[in-house]
Amino acid sequence: MTKFSGNELRAELYRRAFLSYSVAPGALGMFGRSLLAKGARAEALANGTVMSGSHWGVFTATVENGRATAFTPWEKDPHPTPMLEGVLDSIYSPTRIKYPMVRREFLEKGVNADRSTRGNGDFVRVSWDQALDLVAAEVKRVEETYGPQGVFGGSYGWKSPGRLHNCTTLLRRMLTLAGGYVNGAGDYSTGAAQVIMPHVVGTLEVYEQQTAWPVLAENTEVMVFWAADPIKTSQIGWVIPEHGAYPGLEALKAKGTKVIVIDPVRTKTVEFFGADHVTPKPQTDVAIMLGMAHTLVAEDLYDKDFIANYTSGFDKFLPYLMGETDSTPKTAEWASDISGVPAETIKELARLFISKRTMLAAGWSMQRMHHGEQAHWMLVTLASMLGQIGLPGGGFGLSYHYSGGGTPSTSGPALSGITDGGAATKGPEWLAASGASVIPVARVVDMLENPGAEFDFNGTRSKFPDVKMAYWVGGNPFVHHQDRNRMVKAWEKLETFIVHDFQWTPTARHADIVLPATTSYERNDIETIGDYSNTGILAMKKIVEPLYEARSDYDIFAAVAERLGKGKEFTEGKDEMGWIKSFYDDAAKQGKAGGVEMPAFDAFWAEGIVEFPVTDGADFVRYASFREDPLLNPLGTPTGLIEIYSKNIEKMGYDDCPAHPTWMEPLERLDGPGAKYPLHIAASHPFNRLHSQLNGTVLREGYAVQGHEPCLMHPDDAAARGIADGDVVRVHNDRGQILTGVKVTDAVMKGVIQIYEGGWYDPSDVTEPGTLDKYGDVNVLSADIGTSKLAQGNCGQTVLAEVEKYTGPAVTLTGFVAPKAAE
C-alpha cells in the first residue's frame, strides 16, 4: 500500500471518494458479490441447524438453502420469549440497509452541505472503497482541524451481544488510534441512580448481583415491586439471557408470598401474581416513601439499632422528615395529597413492611425523571429504617427486573473481549484547553447547543467541547434521546454524522454516511450466557452469509484504521476467529486456575456451548457480610456505612440535589403546581421489543393500532375527549406532536396514558420545525433536562401532554421501509 502522511493522505482519500462518485452511476458492476467475501470468515451452513444467541436468549436456527427459516428456543430455556420471531424477521426485514449510502447533499458539497435536509431520504449508493475512503478522510479532517475534542465517540445504545463485534468498543478503538475523541459517561437506563448510589452505598448498585431468588422464595414474606415489571423486562438481557428470573418469580408465586406492586399501570407482574396494586400518581414515589418513613418514626416502629450501627447521617435527615427544618412534616397525609395514594394505605404499608421480612425491589423508571437521584436514595433510607438489609430475603434490590438479577451465580470464569485500546484522549493538555473529554451521555444535545459552556457533573465543573463529528454504531439516538425537535435542530451543528447499522433506523436516515453492518446472525462471535448467573459461554456461530453488501463492524473499522495507517494496531494481526479463540482461551486459563475445566477451543466450537455449575450462588445474600461486621466489611462510602446524609454531596452545594433524600417538585407532574397539560405519559419499556430494537419487524403487526404505536388510555379520559378504542389520536405538548392509536383500558389509572418508548421517529417533514411524527415516538414529547447537577441523567418520565382525536389528512408511514434511493 502506498504510504501517505498528513494532508497527502487526507487528500488522497477524498480524491478516491469523489472519483468513485463521478463514475458510480454508470458502473453498477462495481457492486458485485465480491464485496461480501471480504466480510466472510467461516462459511455458514447452506442447510442444517446451528446454535446461536441474542438479547432474547439462546436458540437453534434452521437453515434451508442458505436462508434462516426458524429460530427454536434452547431446550434449557425456562421461559422462551415469543420475540424470537421478530429476531428472525430482522434479518430479512424491508428495513435492511443493503449498500453503503451517502447523503447526496453531503457527497456533493461536503461540510458545506445543507444540514437541515438530513433525514429527507435523498441518498446515493456508493462502493465500499469509496465509502471507506470518505469515512477515513472525514475522521482525519476533523482530528487534524479540531483535535480530538471535535469527535464525539460516545456512541450509546444496546447494540448486539458478542465480545468481538462489540461495535461501540470497536468504534472507540479506531478513534483512539485516530487521535482521540469525546466520550459519554453513564447510560440512559440508570443515569441518576448509578451516580447517587456510590455516594449512598459505595457501588453502582443498579448492576450488582441481588440476593438469590431461592433465598427470597424461602425467606421473603412481602415482596414489593416498586416501578418494576420483571415479568415483562426479564425477557431480555444485556448479554444472552438464560431467563433465570422466571423460575424465581414462579417460586414466589407457588410459595404464596405476598406481592405488592406500586405502579400507575396494571403491569404484567400484577397480573401474574394477582398482586395487591397501589396506583400512585407518577413521579411521586419519594413523597410516598417519606410518608412511610414518617409513620415509622411517629409510631416508634423503625429499627434504631440498624440506623445506629449501619448508617450515617440519619440525625440530619430526621429533622427534615419531621418538618423541623421546613415546617412541613412529611406525614402520610402530606404524601397522600401529592401522590393520590390514601394516607391510611401509606401507613398500613409501613406497618406491614416493618412487621414482615420485606424486600423492596425497585425499578429504574422512578429515577428517569427530574430529581431522579432522590428516589433510590430514599428507597435505601426506607429499607435502612426497616432494618432488614443483609438479612435473607430482606432489604432492597435495584436489578431484580433486569437481565436475570438474582439468578444464582456459577463458578465459571469471566469472558474477556475486544478493548478500546486505551485512553480516549491525547492527554491532560487537551482537557485543560478544550473542555471535557467525557460528558454525561444524556447531555449530548446540551453539548452541541453550547460549546464552551460550563456544566456541573458529580462534583466537577467542566466545559462542553466543540464537537464537529458524531460517529454512531449500535444505537438509535433519534429514538432514545428526549425532546426530538430540539435534538434535530441541535444535530445541525455537526459537520458530519456517520452511522453503521443493519436497518434504516431514524438515526441512520439522519446520517451523512451510512454503512451497512451485518446482523449478529451473519458473523461469528462468542458471548456469556446470563448477565448475573454466568451460566455458560456460547459460540455465536454465523447462521447465514451476509446479505447484500453488509460487512461486520470489525471489518469496517479495520478497513478505516488501515486507511489511517493504523491497520496493524487495530487488528493486532488477528482475524475474526483468531480473536474469538483468544477470548475463549483466556477464559479457559482462568477456569483452570479456579478449578473449572473447559474443553479445548475446537471442541467447544464444535459443541457450541460450555455450561458452568452453580456452587454456593443459590445462597447469596446481598450485604450479608456488611451486616455481619461493618468494620471488617465496610461499604465503599467515606464512612464505610450507608450514607443517609452525604457530606460529599453537601460540599458540592447543588441547589437541585440536597445532602439527604428530599422531595423536590419536578419540572412538571400530574396535578402538580402550574401543570399546563392534564395527562401524564408513562413512557414504559415495551413488551414486544427491546427499546427500539425489533420495531422494524413483523412483531409490530401484533401491537400497532391502525399502523401506529399504541396509546393506552383510561375509559374516563377517553370518554371525556370523545375518543373510542382504535381511534388514531394526536398527542401533543409544547415540545411536539405525535400520532398514536388508542387502546381504551382500565389498566392505566385516570390521568395517565401509556406509550411505550422505542417507537421509531417518522417525521412528516424533516425541514418543518415541530413537524408531526406519524408513527408515535414518545420522546418527541419528553423533556430534555438533566435530573440534577449531580447526575445529569435523562428525564424521559417527566412528560405531560394532551390527547385529541386526529382529524387531519391521512398519513403514509415511511419509517419502516428503506428510503427510495436505497431500495
Curated annotation (Swiss-Prot):
<feature type="binding site">
    <location>
        <position position="553"/>
    </location>
    <ligand>
        <name>Mo-bis(molybdopterin guanine dinucleotide)</name>
    </ligand>
</feature>
<feature type="binding site">
    <location>
        <position position="523"/>
    </location>
    <ligand>
        <name>Mo-bis(molybdopterin guanine dinucleotide)</name>
    </ligand>
</feature>
<feature type="binding site">
    <location>
        <position position="480"/>
    </location>
    <ligand>
        <name>Mo-bis(molybdopterin guanine dinucleotide)</name>
    </ligand>
</feature>
<dbReference type="GO" id="GO:0009061">
    <property type="term" value="P:anaerobic respiration"/>
</dbReference>
<feature type="binding site">
    <location>
        <position position="476"/>
    </location>
    <ligand>
        <name>Mo-bis(molybdopterin guanine dinucleotide)</name>
    </ligand>
</feature>
<dbReference type="GO" id="GO:0050626">
    <property type="term" value="F:trimethylamine-N-oxide reductase (cytochrome c) activity"/>
</dbReference>
<feature type="binding site">
    <location>
        <begin position="364"/>
        <end position="365"/>
    </location>
    <ligand>
        <name>Mo-bis(molybdopterin guanine dinucleotide)</name>
    </ligand>
</feature>
<dbReference type="InterPro" id="IPR009010">
    <property type="entry name" value="Asp_de-COase-like_dom_sf"/>
</dbReference>
<keyword id="KW-0574">Periplasm</keyword>
<dbReference type="GO" id="GO:0030288">
    <property type="term" value="C:outer membrane-bounded periplasmic space"/>
</dbReference>
<keyword id="KW-0479">Metal-binding</keyword>
<dbReference type="InterPro" id="IPR006658">
    <property type="entry name" value="BisC"/>
</dbReference>
<keyword id="KW-0560">Oxidoreductase</keyword>
<protein>
    <recommendedName>
        <fullName>Dimethyl sulfoxide/trimethylamine N-oxide reductase</fullName>
        <ecNumber>1.7.2.3</ecNumber>
        <ecNumber>1.8.5.3</ecNumber>
    </recommendedName>
</protein>
<dbReference type="Pfam" id="PF01568">
    <property type="entry name" value="Molydop_binding"/>
</dbReference>
<dbReference type="Pfam" id="PF18364">
    <property type="entry name" value="Molybdopterin_N"/>
</dbReference>
<feature type="binding site">
    <location>
        <position position="779"/>
    </location>
    <ligand>
        <name>Mo-bis(molybdopterin guanine dinucleotide)</name>
    </ligand>
</feature>
<feature type="binding site">
    <location>
        <position position="189"/>
    </location>
    <ligand>
        <name>Mo-bis(molybdopterin guanine dinucleotide)</name>
    </ligand>
</feature>
<dbReference type="GO" id="GO:0030151">
    <property type="term" value="F:molybdenum ion binding"/>
</dbReference>
<feature type="signal peptide" description="Tat-type signal">
    <location>
        <begin position="1"/>
        <end position="42"/>
    </location>
</feature>
<keyword id="KW-0500">Molybdenum</keyword>
<dbReference type="InterPro" id="IPR050612">
    <property type="entry name" value="Prok_Mopterin_Oxidored"/>
</dbReference>
<feature type="binding site">
    <location>
        <begin position="156"/>
        <end position="160"/>
    </location>
    <ligand>
        <name>Mo-bis(molybdopterin guanine dinucleotide)</name>
    </ligand>
</feature>
<comment type="similarity">
    <text>Belongs to the prokaryotic molybdopterin-containing oxidoreductase family.</text>
</comment>
<feature type="binding site">
    <location>
        <begin position="283"/>
        <end position="285"/>
    </location>
    <ligand>
        <name>Mo-bis(molybdopterin guanine dinucleotide)</name>
    </ligand>
</feature>
<comment type="function">
    <text>Catalyzes the reduction of dimethyl sulfoxide (DMSO) and trimethylamine N-oxide (TMAO) to dimethyl sulfide (DMS) and trimethylamine, respectively. The terminal DMSO reductase can also use various sulfoxides and N-oxide compounds as terminal electron acceptor in addition to DMSO and TMAO.</text>
</comment>
<dbReference type="InterPro" id="IPR006657">
    <property type="entry name" value="MoPterin_dinucl-bd_dom"/>
</dbReference>
<feature type="binding site">
    <location>
        <begin position="691"/>
        <end position="693"/>
    </location>
    <ligand>
        <name>Mo-bis(molybdopterin guanine dinucleotide)</name>
    </ligand>
</feature>
<feature type="binding site">
    <location>
        <begin position="500"/>
        <end position="501"/>
    </location>
    <ligand>
        <name>Mo-bis(molybdopterin guanine dinucleotide)</name>
    </ligand>
</feature>
<dbReference type="InterPro" id="IPR041460">
    <property type="entry name" value="Molybdopterin_N"/>
</dbReference>
<feature type="binding site">
    <location>
        <begin position="796"/>
        <end position="797"/>
    </location>
    <ligand>
        <name>Mo-bis(molybdopterin guanine dinucleotide)</name>
    </ligand>
</feature>
<feature type="binding site">
    <location>
        <begin position="262"/>
        <end position="263"/>
    </location>
    <ligand>
        <name>Mo-bis(molybdopterin guanine dinucleotide)</name>
    </ligand>
</feature>
<dbReference type="InterPro" id="IPR006655">
    <property type="entry name" value="Mopterin_OxRdtase_prok_CS"/>
</dbReference>
<dbReference type="Pfam" id="PF00384">
    <property type="entry name" value="Molybdopterin"/>
</dbReference>
<comment type="subunit">
    <text>Homodimer.</text>
</comment>
<dbReference type="InterPro" id="IPR041954">
    <property type="entry name" value="CT_DMSOR/BSOR/TMAOR"/>
</dbReference>
<keyword id="KW-0732">Signal</keyword>
<dbReference type="InterPro" id="IPR006656">
    <property type="entry name" value="Mopterin_OxRdtase"/>
</dbReference>
<feature type="binding site">
    <location>
        <begin position="685"/>
        <end position="686"/>
    </location>
    <ligand>
        <name>Mo-bis(molybdopterin guanine dinucleotide)</name>
    </ligand>
</feature>
<feature type="binding site">
    <location>
        <position position="368"/>
    </location>
    <ligand>
        <name>Mo-bis(molybdopterin guanine dinucleotide)</name>
    </ligand>
</feature>
<dbReference type="GO" id="GO:0009055">
    <property type="term" value="F:electron transfer activity"/>
</dbReference>
<dbReference type="InterPro" id="IPR006311">
    <property type="entry name" value="TAT_signal"/>
</dbReference>
